[in-house]
């Protein structure tokens, strides 16, 4: 997990929801016919509000409360057949559930206590990994279930990146 805090002038404010422009799209690529990747773009209020996802079951909650955090997750299924898609779907659903359920911790979190928050994200990733392994062992023909996971969590003015596997993320600063 990596945490960044931008050196911001004091006049810079937290962006409003309508000032955040994001988009997600998945594609099967050139090798496989089936798409094994999934994504989620959401904001965390008192509950998670899904803005866009490749998974239709992750419906949005619409409440007009102050945004606590912004979440973007990509799960890139590994391997052929159904196992990669199922692994990426399961990982994305599980990690978003953990993050969404923990939204209340943002109200009580100490702004200077990043270590506790990092440990919580790491624990969530490990729980998803363990659950995916258990699921893989329990389902015949799914022993090779695997996925990468890249998670961005913006809690103004900090960002947290959780990287599991070999998928890349690109960090731009000052347009570069």
Q: Across the structure, where does each feature detected by a protein language model lie?
A:
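PP2C/PPM-type serine/threonine phosphatase catalytic domain
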Residues: 1-176
